[in-house]
């Protein structure tokens, strides 16, 4: 038990220190109001029976970016569809950590899921947690990879969840 408490304290310490480092950076001037993320990959890659191709689109409004002790936060909205016609529409929050040419963007987005002919995730309401790493290609373009987990947080009688990975192309307009 003491070991778990120590781990939690260390995690909180590093999160707070990291947020001050990010906060200390000079804020970048926003020249483009919108960032679009086009992605494709494999939905539920860890389940051989329900694995499927996925494509999606996400929008981030750069004019709504806010600094916080957790870093730079912004709202995101998007949708995805699998080859089995499962769909997920979501909106939530994304943190942005600028590490030079590399961007790290974790996000949390509640949404509405329809299984179509795909995997039954157990509930209409699902929650997506995602980690994304992207690299600057050009001034307004990035290429990245992301991993996410979609789960209903035990709202339904069953909660199988789905793990997915995607390749991302991000463009600011």
Place the predicted regions along the sequence by residue:
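Short loop/turn motifs that connect adjacent beta-strands in outer-membrane beta-barrel proteins
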Residues: 24-33, 47, 63-73, 98-104, ...
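Residue-level signature of outer-membrane beta-barrel architecture
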Residues: 59-61, 95-97, 135, 149, ...
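Helix-adjacent hinge/juxtasegments
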Residues: 84-108
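Mid-chain, well-packed structural core segment of small domains
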Residues: 103-129
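Outer-membrane beta-barrel "beta-signal"
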Residues: 51-57, 135, 160-173
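Transmembrane beta-strand segments that form the barrel wall of outer-membrane beta-barrel proteins
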Residues: 35-44, 70-82, 105-114, 146-151
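Solvent-exposed loop/turn segments connecting transmembrane beta-strands
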Residues: 43-53, 79-90, 117-124, 154-162
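Cleavable N-terminal export/targeting peptides
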Residues: 1-31
């Amino acid at each position: 038990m003491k070991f778990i408490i120590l781990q939690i304290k260390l995690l909180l310490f590093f999160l707070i220190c990291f947020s001050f480092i990010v906060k200390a950076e000079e804020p970048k001037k926003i020249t483009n109001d919108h960032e679009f993320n086009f992605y494709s990959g494999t939905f539920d890659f860890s389940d051989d029976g329900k694995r499927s191709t996925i494509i999606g689109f996400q929008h981030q409004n750069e004019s709504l970016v806010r600094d916080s002790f957790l870093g730079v936060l912004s709202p995101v909205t998007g949708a995805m569809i699998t080859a089995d016609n499962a769909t997920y529409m979501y909106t939530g929050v994304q943190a942005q950590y600028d590490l030079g040419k590399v961007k790290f963007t974790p996000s949390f987005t509640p949404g509405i899921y329809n299984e179509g002919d795909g995997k039954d995730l157990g509930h209409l309401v699902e929650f997506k947690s995602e980690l994304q790493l992207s690299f600057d290609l050009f001034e307004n373009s990035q290429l990245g990879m992301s991993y996410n987990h979609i789960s209903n947080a035990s709202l339904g009688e069953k909660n199988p969840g789905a793990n997915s990975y995607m390749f991302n192309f991000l463009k600011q307009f």
